[in-house]
UniProtKB/Swiss-Prot annotation:
Zn(2+) binds at residues 96, 99, 121, 124. GO terms for cellular component: plasma membrane. Plays an essential role in type IV pili and type II pseudopili formation by proteolytically removing the leader sequence from substrate proteins and subsequently monomethylating the alpha-amino group of the newly exposed N-terminal phenylalanine. This is Prepilin leader peptidase/N-methyltransferase. One of its GO terms (biological process) is signal peptide processing. The chain crosses the membrane at residues 35-55, 147-167, 183-203, 207-227, 230-250, 253-273, 288-308.
Amino acid sequence: MPTASMTPNPFLSGSPEHAAAAGPLAAFAALPTGMQLAFAIVLGLVVGSFINVVVHRLPIMMKRAWLAEIAEATGAPCADDGLPARYNLCVPRSACPHCGHALRAWENVPVLSYIALRGRCRHCRTPIGARYPLIELASGALAAGALALFGPSGAALAAFGLCAALLAMSAIDMQTGFLPDSLTLPLLWAGLCVNLWGTFASLRAAVIGAIAGYLFLWCILWLFKLLRGIEGIGYGDLKLLAALGAWLGWEALPQVVLIAAVAGAAVGLVATWRGRMRFEEPLPFGPFLAAGGAATLFFGTPFYLLLGG
């Protein structure tokens, strides 16, 4: 919950009464509720389309950087991956990963282009993964949820930013098994900055949350290593929980961890029972931490009480 502050909180100034301070947010707040909701959904869909770019390209960019470092250290030539030399989140244009067909503007419209193309590349007819429209729809729903919960305010934008980052990291973790520092660490600092004004937690609770989130899973990691001789959790998960602590405060961490643990155990057991994975096979924990963080952001303590807290 936002805490009182002696200085104006720019993240909570979206109501018409704060027109002078809010600027564009005040104008947005004056729009009919239906228009606000429609705008939020469209914004969420567009951001979801960009999240798909991040999920696809960021692991490739990181692999390139690792290989370049290895080549520099060993003097060996870097293997050619067949991609342009200039490859980042902005260039080159989006293209089919199978045939290289550069997508036109209408082929990049979130969700609608997937429906129009019937889930296949227009050029080579290779199926397009369902991940793309699902992430776009999830992003649109999260944007609408943030607006409904926090109203037309900076807090809603910040909440959606958190959810968008969690969505991107979850997809990357499920795809690759790791959480990039280039996402977890900026998310941690962003949480501390947002809570300078006590937007979601006091600054004190946010700092303690960042420290406690990291140390808690660090202890679990080393306890597991002492008992089993292996690391049962990745360091990216430590940084993600630290980031959630920075956003939501230390008081939210038990609920986040409980939701993540219960959801992870349930999914793992069902997947093992159905033969989708072996019992000893590692299951990415990042998506469950992200789900716990999003659930805590949107539902707060009552959600924890429903679980028996």
